[in-house]
Amino acid sequence: MITGLITKIIGSRNDRYLKKLRKVADEINKLEPQMKALSDEELKAKTIEFKERLASGESLDKILVEAFAVVRNASERVFGMRQFDVQLIGGMVLNDNKIAEMRTGEGKTLTATLPAYLNALSGKGVHIITVNDYLAGRDAKWNAKLFEFLGLTVGINISGMSGDQKRAAYAADITYGTNNEFGFDYLRDNMAFEAQQRVMRSLHYAIIDEVDSILIDEARTPLIISGPTDGDATLYTELNTVIPMLTQQDKEDTEEYIGEGDFTVDEKNKQVLLTERGQEKVEVILQERGLLDENQSLYSAASISLLHHVNAALRAHTLFEKDVEYIVTEKGEVVIVDEHSGRTMPGRRWSEGLHQAVEAKEGVQIQNENQTLASITFQNYFRLYEKLAGMTGTADTEAFEFQSIYGLETIVIPTNQAMIRKDGGDLVYLTEQEKYQAIVDDIKPRLEKGQPILVGTVSIEHSELLSDLMDKAKIKHSVLNAKFHAKEADIIAQAGALGSVTIATNMAGRGTDIVLGGNLEARLDKLGDVSPKEIEAEKELWKEEHKKVLKAGGLYIVGTERHESRRIDNQLRGRSGRQGDPGESRFYLSMEDSLMRIFASEKVSNMMKKLGMEKGEAIEHPWVSRAIENAQRKVEGRNFDMRKSLLDFDDVSNEQRKVIYQQRNGVIDSEEITETIEQIWDDVFHNCVNEYVPPHSLTEQWDLEGLEQRLKADFLVDLPVRQWSIDDANLQEGSIREKVVEHAKASYLAKKEQVGPAIIGSFEKSVMLQTIDTLWKEHLAAMDHLRQGIHLRGYAQKDPKQEYKRESFELFLQMLENLKREVVVILSKVQVQSKEEADVIQEQRRQAEAKAQLEMKHAQVNKGEVVSDENTGDDTFVRNEKKVGRNEPCPCGSGKKYKQCHGKLD
């Protein structure tokens, strides 16, 4: 109460901040006459002037007022549109490393041109990030006219581009692209073998459009580059037949309650757990089929992989429903449906064997599992930028998360014109059937007066169910869901047309404005090549229809179910009432809806019982709306905790990733790594000697024979260490260490002299990079295994996060030691007699790189989701010749086994 009183007197932080920016906007407005007086050439020349002023030491803040005035005037000349004062304020918020919440239709795309221009003047590059290729292409094409008029270059970074095309895109002053593509390019650059293979510049400034979608909804979905592993698809098929033999139990076993089912389903946390009875039943079935040894448990160390497959099959059958979480295409592919947008995600795959389990369940071809080669979460990728900003229509409900995780403050920008949309209260019915019938009954009279209607559903299944009801009621409508992805923008653009009814899955079509009366440009395009008179007639017709739609009450939004997040509901409502237009919205709910059933059922159902509701009756009361909102807050809090927990774990691997990538880039960018190799050489041989001749030890503790054998076996260094001890009775361990290192170095230096420092230097870099990549890949797999079982430490009264940090650090230190040793082993054993043979080895390495089969993936941790854009991946490598076995003779003709020769380089 006191806080509210103080806010009323001095205003909120948001109000005070906006008040300060309004003063700056007034200064920009004062420059308008001056800018209008300039010719096109004089206005363009301002860009060169600003760059010179920055080069001489002026800050961006000093030139902001003038730069914004230049962009505003250029926008008017190029587009015939000028930024409103609220858009100037939005631009300043973005420049100030904050999130601008701007309502739908307030011109976020035009707002972003202001800070993009200002920050591009530094020459370090600006990235404008959107959620899909369509929006990236559309915005780049449109805004390029403005930026090129002002003398700046624009690039576009989308899937399927070559390395040269991407380098050109990143070299531009302003680059548009998707979050996936920027993230994958970062990972690919850090897997490159040569500096010229990289495509990106430094990560300077990013503006994220629909920032809530990317930094919140996709925060749990790391980007992964992976390669195939040797998996057995038959196990998935076998286990798929086991699950139908199990029965579900309503709740978990406790001391007081022992059920008769085999597994329980926790819808709230999206988990399935075998009961003790179920575990025993599954073990018996698996033992009968020869998949599990007798007297062995599913939970024994040797059966962990089998348990992993059983859990995946259980989840596939109980938590993942066809036409809700995924669809099956005509080609027999299981394609994931994005739970937030309702779009299909071709090429993306769930991880942890879940996708294979779903494929087995649907009876389609089962693809192999993959091994992670490189990964990063969006949370950690975007925190790499020096400056980061974002814009969206719905950020305020997630302001705390933006601030605590990304350090981004959310500023709510006022609308240019007052919002007059009427938001009706929630109507709650007992059953889904009653709810859908009520929606159809509500739509009929509104259609008679020509009011356009947009119906939002949560799944493909529900959109098709509602579509069938409308067909029976003879209501003409369009359906937009994951199955009609290509028509998305067109359908949404015409959703505001007179008398149109559109059913859309969740927030499909986000980023496309719904104009009352329909999209005029699209209507004119359909006319084709017609006379100016016909074009004018079409425009007049559109104006008439626009007036009728306004009179009918504007766009009516119908929500068929509350989402887990209030923000998603607000996004749906936000499609109506743009730029001061009239509009209406209402949510229809039932006690059978997921959110109501799982989170809000008890309170609301008790309320409905007290009211004595009958079939077909609905309840509308502020108490009900409050109960639903409280349920949503609970879910939002739980989801935030999950994302925060993910970040805590990923921060551990993120620090390790930085070290590895820094090492790789240091190797690539150095002309030679002689000093690094010498240091590694000293460390490895010192450690080797210390194992057999411990420091400050007695002669009796020495194992000189073991040292000789180790030096010869691992490094091909044949030294008479025992003879040294016989020849010199006073020989100290320090002297042994020095002599071993000296002889080993001399042997390697002789090899370098033989082929020349340039060739061996290039070879050293190649060995170093390939060894880093191999061990990093193995380390990522070890980290995955560690993480999957770390929660069990809680039962031993230990903090799983602290244990994960400690053990992963130990694994990392061990990996760094292994890296040094592996490099020295390979360099010691390699036999290069001539320049020609060195060239052969280099060529083999290049061929290996060319054949590398990589898949870009995007994995959702809470559901085990992995995503791969099939347009970005290389074609699958098919081996034409027999693979060389590790113990077979090396094909180079050296006479050695493959694993001891060129197999070391694989």
From Swiss-Prot:
Binding of ATP, residues: 87, 105-109, 513
Which residues are Zn(2+)-binding?
890, 892, 901-902
Role played: Part of the Sec protein translocase complex. Interacts with the SecYEG preprotein conducting channel. Has a central role in coupling the hydrolysis of ATP to the transfer of proteins into and across the cell membrane, serving both as a receptor for the preprotein-SecB complex and as an ATP-driven molecular motor driving the stepwise translocation of polypeptide chains across the membrane.
This chain's protein is named Protein translocase subunit SecA
Pfam families named in the record: P-loop_SecA (PF21090), SEC-C (PF02810), SecA_DEAD (PF07517), SecA_PP_bind (PF01043), SecA_SW (PF07516)
Instruction: Provide the assembly information.
Output: Monomer and homodimer. Part of the essential Sec protein translocation apparatus which comprises SecA, SecYEG and auxiliary proteins SecDF-YajC and YidC.
> What kind of membrane protein is this, topologically?
Peripheral membrane protein
The UniProt entry's GO biological process terms, in alphabetical order, are: intracellular protein transmembrane transport; protein import; protein targeting; protein transport by the Sec complex
The chemistry this enzyme catalyses reads: ATP + H2O + cellular proteinSide 1 = ADP + phosphate + cellular proteinSide 2
Q: Which PANTHER family match?
A: CHLOROPLAST PROTEIN-TRANSPORTING ATPASE (PTHR30612:SF0), SECA INNER MEMBRANE COMPONENT OF SEC PROTEIN SECRETION SYSTEM (PTHR30612)
**Any GO CC annotation of this UniProt entry:** cytosol
Q: PROSITE patterns from the xrefs?
A: SECA, SECA_MOTOR_DEAD
The entry's localization annotation reads: Cell inner membrane; Cytoplasm
Disordered: region residues = 860-906
Any one GO molecular-function label of the UniProt entry = metal ion binding
Q: Which InterPro entries does the entry mention?
A: Helicase_ATP-bd, Helicase_C-like, P-loop_NTPase, SEC_C_motif, SecA, SecA_CS, SecA_DEAD, SecA_motor_DEAD
Q: Where is the composition biased (Basic residues)?
A: 896-906
**Record field: compositional bias (Basic and acidic residues):** 876-886
Family annotation (Gene3D superfamilies) = Helical scaffold and wing domains of SecA (1.10.3060.10), P-loop containing nucleotide triphosphate hydrolases (3.40.50.300), SecA, preprotein cross-linking domain (3.90.1440.10)
The record's free-text note on cofactor binding: May bind 1 zinc ion per subunit.
What keywords would UniProt list here? ATP-binding, Cell inner membrane, Cell membrane, Cytoplasm, Membrane, Metal-binding, Nucleotide-binding, Protein transport, Translocase, Translocation, Transport, Zinc
